[in-house]
Amino acid sequence: MLSEVNKISKNFAINQEIREKEVRLISSTGEQLGVVSGRDAQRMADEAELDLVMISPNAKPPVCKIMDYGKFIYEQSKKEKEAKKKQKVISVKEIRVSPTIEKHDLEIKAKNAKKFLEAGDKVKITVRFRGREAEHSHVGVKILDSFLAQLEEVCSVEKPAKLEGRNMIMILAPKKA
């Protein structure tokens, strides 16, 4: 929490840190007071017992606002937390199978994949070939096709089956509701 406040507070110059000759001033109520000298703006903030905060340093002249700086930092950190909450992290879950997998085992793996997809995660299915099994890549394609057939109502193919080294990989994404 404290580090977030420090990050936010470094972005804004306040009170004596503002060395501009002229600034565009906004009062604590949000009223435009126009362009005033930096000293006058600081004096007005002191009279109101509030802080002078430079909101937009790149503007000509820079925009400053008279406000309670502590409250401003609190509001900014609250906005950042709210924005973070709204971001959904999509993870990729991997399910590994061998080319000699039995039908029942494949069904169980498909059920697990379905749970992941319903939770909103992507699923990466890997068929791992060992030794001479790599010569029979068509078996891997059959396995991935039967896997997909069991899940077609809850997923879409993001990346079709492709042989990468000794692994055949297919990535499934949840269907948009």
Curated annotation (Swiss-Prot):
Keywords: Cytoplasm, Initiation factor, Protein biosynthesis
GO BP annotations listed: ribosome disassembly
Keyword Electron transport attached: no
GO MF term set: ribosome binding; translation initiation factor activity
Coiled coil: none
One cellular component (GO) term of this entry: membrane
Pfam families: IF3_C, IF3_N
Cell location: Cytoplasm
Major place of residence: cytoplasm
Quaternary structure and partners: Monomer.
Summary of the function given for this chain in its UniProt record: IF-3 binds to the 30S ribosomal subunit and shifts the equilibrium between 70S ribosomes and their 50S and 30S subunits in favor of the free subunits, thus enhancing the availability of 30S subunits on which protein synthesis initiation begins.
UniProt family annotation: Belongs to the IF-3 family.
Name of the protein: Translation initiation factor IF-3
Organism: Clostridium perfringens (strain 13 / Type A)
Gene symbol of the encoding locus: infC
